[in-house]
Design a protein with these regions (language model features):
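Helix-breaking motifs and short loop linkers at transmembrane-helix boundaries and internal kinks
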Residues: 46, 78, 99-105, 133, ...
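Extracytoplasmic gate region of multi-pass secondary transporters
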Residues: 35, 220-272
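Extracellular/periplasmic helix-loop-helix junction of adjacent transmembrane segments
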Residues: 35-65, 258-259
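Glycine-rich segments within core transmembrane alpha-helices of 12-TM secondary carriers
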Residues: 138-163, 354-364
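Conserved MFS/SLC helix-loop-helix module at the cytosolic interface between two early adjacent transmembrane helices
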Residues: 65-101
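Cytoplasmic helix-loop-helix junction between adjacent transmembrane helices
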Residues: 109-146
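C-terminal ends and interior cores of transmembrane alpha-helices
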Residues: 88-101, 296-310
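Cytosolic juxtamembrane N-terminal segment immediately preceding the first transmembrane helix
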Residues: 1-29
Length: 423
């Protein structure tokens, strides 16, 4: 039975795909728990809406630091080792959140959890982009992002189950304690997944890694700035919805935990299919045009969802497209950013752009929390998200087209990077 691009993958490509897919999925389960339990944290720990926004910001700042830091490390000790480390890191600090007794405790743990998640996303994206051949890279690397939807679905599914067995004051702690489970994935990665052959070849050719500032040198500066700005817009808009949508459904639309889970299920279903559509489209019309198309679609969808009067049935449909368009945008950054840099600085470049986008974009959900004190939550969410998507669209205009790029040719055309490594 033929399964499209999956049937065309080799054994190592398939194992790498599942390792990266699983890493995204299980880390997603851990990180999305926070947005789901914000109402419980407000009720049981007494945190305010602005403080809830600061929790989201702390994770994104941590992801910014962790993305670049893990990227720098992956360019030096290997993609596979860092991937394992980041998965364990996220699982551990999600578990520690179960024992928090105050807002300040949660803030610290959330920051540290973000370090691992930012690193895993960056390094996993580089690994799958290097292992898969150019003709399939867009579809396969983008499909890894669908793991995020799976992880989100698991956390949403766990919430009503945990709530039915435990009171609200304890339920959120149990949910965080379950976040230790992704650590099991590391045993699979250690046993079955090979290191990137492109990385191994580059490491043999030059054992010394270039300095951290190499991604800002020469022609890489323009790529780094444009990619980081686009990432800022995409993640800023996404985290408005991830952080505040559960609260919006329960406070503005007056849904119960069970009722809001149904709405979120449609959002998650869209997030599962969006990356598959983007990957197929980007391998045909190119990365840039695909980004611009989905940014326009998402901006229109968000405007209708949050700023226009719509009935319950329409809201369910819009939830699906909200997840689909956002999943598509997030997935496209994995192959695109990997195709901008030579192997010796690929992980640090992708780590900075993805992590920087999360960090700079962290002001967006925090701004929602501040604006929501004096404005309707939907208005605050919609205005902030639309500004973020506008920034991403402008940045996409500046990026070069990279679809189908041979990563070996990038290495051959970047002798200056190797000279930097010698200093």
């Amino acid at each position: 039975m033929k399964l499209g691009w999956y049937s065309a993958l080799t054994g190592p490509e398939r194992r790498t795909f599942w390792a990266c897919f699983g890493g995204f999925g299980l880390d997603s389960m851990d990180t999305t728990m926070y947005g789901l339990v914000i109402p419980s944290l407000i009720a049981t720990l007494g945190i305010s809406r602005p403080e809830a926004g600061y929790l989201a910001t702390a994770a994104l700042v941590g992801a910014a630091i962790g993305g670049w830091g893990a990227g720098l490390l992956a360019d030096r000790i290997g993609r596979l080792r860092v991937l394992q480390l980041t998965i364990l890191w996220v699982a551990a600090f999600t578990f520690f959140a179960a024992f928090a007794t105050s807002f300040s405790h949660l803030l610290v743990v959330r920051l540290l959890q973000g370090l691992g998640y930012g690193g895993e996303a960056a390094v996993g994206g580089v690994l799958i982009s290097e292992v898969v051949r150019p003709a399939l890279r867009g579809r396969v690397a983008a499909s890894v992002q669908s793991g995020y939807a799976l992880g989100y679905a698991i956390s949403v599914g766990l919430l009503p189950i945990v709530s039915s067995f435990f009171p609200e004051a304890i339920g959120w702690r149990v949910l965080f304690a379950l976040g230790i489970l992704p650590a099991v994935l590391v045993f699979f990665v250690r046993r079955l997944v090979p290191e990137s052959s492109i990385y191994s070849e580059a490491k043999k050719a030059s054992a010394e890694a270039p300095p951290f500032w190499a991604i800002f040198a020469g022609p890489h500066l323009r790529h780094t700035v444009a990619a980081a700005l686009m990432s800022t817009g995409i993640f800023g808009g996404a985290y408005v919805m991830i952080t505040w949508l559960p609260t919006y459904l329960r406070s503005a639309l007056h849904l119960s935990i069970t009722g809001s889970s149904g709405y979120l299920a449609m959002n998650i279903l869209g997030s599962l299919f969006g990356p598959l559509i983007y990957g197929w489209l980007s391998d045909r019309i190119g990365r840039r045009y695909s980004f611009m198309t989905f940014l326009l679609l998402q901006a229109g969808n968000v405007a209708i969802y949050l700023l226009a009067p719509v009935d319950a049935g329409t809201t369910v449909l819009l939830n699906f497209f909200l997840g689909a368009f956002q999943g598509a945008l997030a997935s496209g950054m994995l192959p695109t950013f990997a195709e901008l840099y030579p192997t010796s600085i690929r992980a640090s470049g992708q780590g900075f752009c993805l992590g920087g986008g999360r960090g700079f974009g962290s002001v967006v959900p925090a701004s929602v929390g501040i604006l929501a004190v004096n404005h309707p939550l939907g208005t605050a969410m919609g205005g902030c998200a639309l500004c973020a998507y506008a920034l991403a669209f402008v940045a996409a205009l500046v990026l070069p087209e990279t679809s189908g790029t041979d990563l070996h040719r990038i290495d051959a055309a970047a002798p200056a990077i190797q000279q930097m490594a010698g200093h």
